[in-house]
Each structure stands twice: as C-alpha cells, then as structure tokens.
UniProtKB/Swiss-Prot annotation:
Glycans are attached at residues 141, 588. Residues 29-601 are lumenal. The chain crosses the membrane at residues 8-28. InterPro entries: GalNAc-T, Glyco_trans_2-like, Nucleotide-diphossugar_trans, Ricin_B-like_lectins, Ricin_B_lectin. It holds the Pfam family Glycos_transf_2. GO terms for molecular function: carbohydrate binding; metal ion binding; polypeptide N-acetylgalactosaminyltransferase activity. Keywords: Disulfide bond, Glycoprotein, Glycosyltransferase, Golgi apparatus, Lectin, Manganese, Membrane, Metal-binding, Signal-anchor, Transferase, Transmembrane, Transmembrane helix. This is Polypeptide N-acetylgalactosaminyltransferase-like 6. Disulfide bonds join 130-360, 351-427, 466-483, 518-533, 558-573. The keyword Electron transport does not apply. Catalyzes the initial reaction in O-linked oligosaccharide biosynthesis, the transfer of an N-acetyl-D-galactosamine residue to a serine or threonine residue on the protein receptor. Residues 1-7 are cytoplasmic. The gene is GALNTL6. It comes from Homo sapiens. GO terms for cellular component: Golgi apparatus; Golgi membrane.
Length: 601
C-alpha cells in the first residue's frame, strides 16, 4: 500500500513540474525577445547579442521563421561619421546661403544639398521597439520606382545612395529611375555614366512630358519585382526601412503599406519627424490631405506596430505587383499629379484590401518651398479630384461640390472603364468606407459643416476700421484698414470676411469657403498672425464674449489694436477699452452661447 502511495506521489510531482515548466518553453522566445535584446544608453557603446543580425533565424508560434534584418556593421559605420549635415543635423547657413537663386531651379536649397555628403548619416528616430523587431526570413523582393523631372543632381544621387546603403541587397530586384522628359544636361549622359556603377539601377525615359502618375505607371509596367515600391526623387531612406514594409505584404498580399514620412527641411536639410509623428491619413471635403490622431480604439499595445490609415499621403508606398494591377493600377485618365493618392486609397479599401502606415519604416522627404517647374497647359487638379469623386465617392461627392461649386461643371472625361472596373472587383460603396474605415474623419472634418458662431467683417469699435488679412499666408500679421463696406478703394486687395467656426478658430473667408489659415497668437503682447490651421485648438482657440472682446485662453489675454498705427496685437483684457471691442457682422447666438458654455464648464 505504501509503495502505491509513494509511486502516486512521484507521479503527481512529475505532473506538477510539467505543468509549471512546459508552458514556459513556448514563452521563452517571447521572454528572450523582450528582455535579452537591449538598446544602448546614450553615449554607451552599442553591442549586439549573438544571433541577431548574423543571419540566425527564430521560429514564431505561427510556424514562420523570422530574422533580424538590421545591418549592424553599416549602422556602426554611420555612427562614426562627422561633418556638416551628418546625422541629419541642419547645415549651418550664412546670409548668402539664403539667396533665392539657391531655390529657383529645385524649390529647395541646392547649395546645401551640394555641400553635404551623398552618403550622409541620418538619426535613428524610430520607436525603441523597432530595434528589436524580427521580420519574416523569406520576404518578397521589390522593384523601387523613382520618377523624376528636372531633379537636382545631388538630391537625386543622395536618394539612390541611401537606398543602396540602407537596404538588404537581396530584397532589391531593381531600382527603376523614370525620367519624365527632363531638360537638364546633368540628367542625360552624365546620369547614365554615374548609375552604371550600380548593377541594379536602370533608367527609363519618356518621349514627352507625362506627369507623375503616368511615369509611375510606366515604371510599374516594366518592373520585375514581386513588390512595387514607389519613392520620390528627393528622399533619404532611414535604417532598416524596407523589411517592415515587405513583411506586411508577405503576411497579406492585398495590403498597401506606407512608411512614416519624415521632414527634410528645404532650407538647411535638417532631418526630423513630422509634427505629431504617427497619425492617420485623412482628408477634408475640399480634398485637402490631412493627418488626424490615431483614435484609442485603433491604438496598439505596441506603438511601433503598423496601424490602419484611410488614405495615404501619396508618393511613398509599397504594394504587391500583381495586386496593384488587379486593382487597375492608377486611373490613366488622371493628369500629371493630384488626386491619385485618394484614388488608390479608396480603391484598395473598397475592393477587398487594406492599408497600413508602418512606424518602423521611416523615409525622409524634402517638402519643396514651391514647385519649380511649370505644369503643362490644359491640366487641372480640380478635374482629377472630380474624376476620383465621380468614380469612387458616390453621393458623398456632393459634399465636395457644396464647398467647390466650380467643380460641378467640370468635365471628368470618360470614366466608364473605371466604373466597370469597380463593378468587376465587386467593390463596396463609399458609405461603407466612411463607416468602416474613415469613421473618425467626420469628427475633424464633418461632411455637413456645423453652423458658425459668427462671420463677416470684424469691425473695431474704437477705430471704426476692419480686420484685414490682405490674402496673406502663414506669418502674415493682421492689420486694421478702412472697411470695404464703407467704400474702401482697391477692394480686390482686401480680405475682410472671416468665419468664427465650429472648431472655435477664426479663418479668412465665408462659411464653407474658408481658407486654411487661422488667427494665431503666441503670448501676451504678441501680434496676431495667420498660421496654418491645425485644428488642435491651442494658440488658435478663441472666445467671443458678451463684452465684445475676443478672448485668447492660452495667453489669457484679449485682441487689442492701435488705431493710429493700424496694428493688431494681444494685451491684458480690459472690457472697458473700446480698442478691445470687436463687432462681427453676423452672429448666431445659439452657437455662440454653446461655445461660451463649453469654455466656462
């Protein structure tokens, strides 16, 4: 009997140990990934654990093998670089370097571009978790397609060098440069000779000016890679940028993926993240591209994980080649540029695919100061946008026409082939897109604009003059001027109609037709200027009180003026001062009271 009890106790002990130990075997790789791979502290020599970055593979619970794709030798080599512009630091500029001639041909400071290294180093500004991520061992290769027209020599070369230096060679099937009928000599034989050193680079040239959309289509039609990756010709890809993109496509080939697009300053070439960094792509109902916060419902436990985005910014993305052509590529009826990012975004979501932004993939992009070349005559961004709206947006196109009535009578050209494609692909309607994908967009950009609190001219009581923004842009200081309705001359030069809208900001223009600039003030005593509207309140939040003062909560001050000098500025609130009293031409008291109740609650 005792022997049986002893044997029973032994078996029970073994079973208990098994219960404790065996489940944790499966957890080992998770523990190892989380705790055994450590990033260096600032100033500490980076060391890399055995098995990471040396081709060793790791099996996941889904049975797929993954590896670390980082090139640590290259990373350490870049860390040792020094010089002007290295590590993405701004180039030190003198007064002469700001001369407009440096911008004239390219829309960015070509002098700076010519004076920083073609293989300059960049800061690794990824989320820390990106440094430990593994991606599939077997990733598809890609054709990288780069259209260009009259691009600067060094900006184009820097794009290519960054790709070659920061991309695993096995993942590059080819790099296709598509020359859209450039005229500059350095982009002809000189470019051919330079690119001959790169075995995977080939140059394709158009026979006439085709525009960005058709040059991308031309490059895609000649591509051999399993994936198409589109980049602009003035970019710099960052560390380990490609594997995170290809990984998403390998997991689901009906996926379009976009990198985080960082900003390379057009003046000093400093490299930094966009304001807000990881945000969802969106649009307003005039079809301007916007970025909105990721809602809590879509935020991942790991902020470095890919997240869904309704629309892409446009120029930088990757897509499975076969899936791209199943979707019909770009609509070939779109001219030059504009609207294509909406067309491909709506199409992929409505026709059975999905789109993600990938925080662990980062690419710097020069946002030009202005477009340096002429768009061929007869082309129209408005026509492109209407063509997309009529093909994909169904009854929601009406919201665009309400804000852009001039679009109603534009010709879209023949869209029957696009309508038939949508039918063949069994695509969902735009109402589904707004409900299932872009459900958070109306919170920031409602299709039906809520009524404003006040609009029309803003007249100062003391001066009997009106606020005038003179059709200015960001940085323009507001001034007082003779009110147009009082018989001011040269009315075309004035801009005296403003809207105090539902966002509680003040914009030039009438309701439904406001411009994208807002009254902005930094602090007490600062001038009141126009600044790009950001919709995040802050410096652009205003209140219109019963004493007719325009109150600025952030600075705890009121809008004031100097009638003699016609200046407008912020000052300590004094409700008895007539220079701080402003009269809106039209007021909706119901909305205004709601604003004030919200401000006081």
């Amino acid at each position: 009997m005792k022997r049986k009890q002893k044997r029973f106790l032994q078996m029970t002990l073994l079973f208990t140990v098994a219960l404790i130990f065996l489940p944790n075997v499966g957890l080992w790789s998770l523990y190892k990934d989380k705790h055994l791979v450590k990033s260096a502290e600032p100033g500490e020599q980076q060391t890399f654990p055995l098995g990471l970055g040396d081709g060793q593979f790791y099996s996941w619970t889904d049975g797929l093998r993954r590896k670390d794709w980082h090139d640590y030798e290259s990373i350490q080599k870049e860390a040792m670089r020094s010089g002007k512009g290295e590590h993405g630091k701004p180039y030190p500029l003198t007064e002469e370097d700001h001369d407009d001639s440096a911008y004239r041909e390219n829309g960015f400071n070509i002098f700076v571009s010519n004076n920083i290294a073609l293989e300059r180093s960049l800061p690794d500004i990824r989320h820390a978790n990106c440094k430990h991520k593994m991606y599939l061992e077997r990733l598809p290769n890609t054709s990288i397609i780069i259209p260009f027209h009259n691009e600067g020599w060094t900006s184009l070369l820097r794009t290519i060098h960054s790709i070659i230096n920061r991309t695993p060679g096995s993942l590059i099937a080819e790099i296709i440069l598509v020359d859209d009928f450039s005229e500059r000599e350095h982009l002809k034989d000189k470019l051919e000779e330079y690119m001959a050193r790169f075995s995977k680079v080939r140059i394709v040239r158009t026979k006439k000016r085709e525009g960005l959309i058709r040059t991308r289509l031309l490059g895609a039609s000649m591509a051999r890679g399993e994936v198409l990756t589109f980049l602009d010709s003035h970019c710099e890809v960052n560390v380990n940028w490609l594997p995170p993109l290809l990984n998403q496509i390998a997991l689901n080939h009906k996926t379009i993926v976009c990198p985080m697009i960082d900003v390379i300053d057009h003046n000093h070439f400093g490299y930094e993240a966009q304001a807000g960094d990881a945000m969802r792509g969106a649009f307003d109902w005039e079809m301007y591209y916007k970025r909105i916060p990721i809602p809590p419902e879509l935020q991942r436990a790991d902020p470095s994980d890919p997240f869904e985005s309704p629309v892409m910014a446009g120029g930088l993305f990757a897509v499975d080649r076969k899936w791209f052509w199943e979707l019909g590529g770009y609509d070939p009826g779109l001219e030059i540029w504009g609207g294509e990012q909406y067309e491909i975004s709506f199409k992929v979501w409505m026709c059975g695919g999905e789109m993600f932004d990938v925080p662990c993939s980062r690419v710097g992009h020069i946002y030009r100061k202005y477009v340096p070349y002429k768009v061929p005559s007869g082309t129209s961004l408005a026509r492109n946008l209407k063509r997309v709206a009529e093909t994909w947006m169904d009854e929601f196109a009406e919201y665009i026409y309400q804000r852009r009535p001039e679009y109603r009578h534009l010709s879209t050209g023949d869209i029957s082939a696009q309508k038939e494609l949508r039918k063949q692909l069994k695509c969902k309607d735009f109402k589904w897109f707004m409900a299932a994908v872009a459900w958070d967009v109306p919170k920031y950009y409602p299709p039906v604009e809520p009524p404003p609190a006040a609009w029309g001219e803003i007249r100062n009581v003391a001066a009997n003059l009106c606020v005038d923004s003179k059709h200015g842009a960001t940085g323009t200081e507001l001034r007082l001027d003779i009110c147009v309705k009082d018989g001011s001359e040269r009315t075309w030069s004035h801009e005296q109609l403003f809207t105090f809208g539902w966002r509680e900001d003040i914009r030039p223009g009438e309701p439904l037709h406001t411009r994208k600039f807002c009254f902005d003030a930094i602090s007490h005593n600062s001038p009141v200027t126009l600044y790009d509207c950001h919709g995040m309140k802050g410096n652009q939040l205003w209140g219109y009180r019963k004493d007719r003062t325009l109150f600025h909560p952030v600075s705890n001050s009121c809008m004031d003026c100097n009638p003699a000098e016609k200046k407008i500025f912020m000052a300590r609130c004094d409700p008895l001062s007539e220079t701080q009293q402003w009269i809106f031409e039209h007021i909706n008291m119901t909305v205004l009271e709601k604003f004030n109740h919200h401000a006081n609650s």
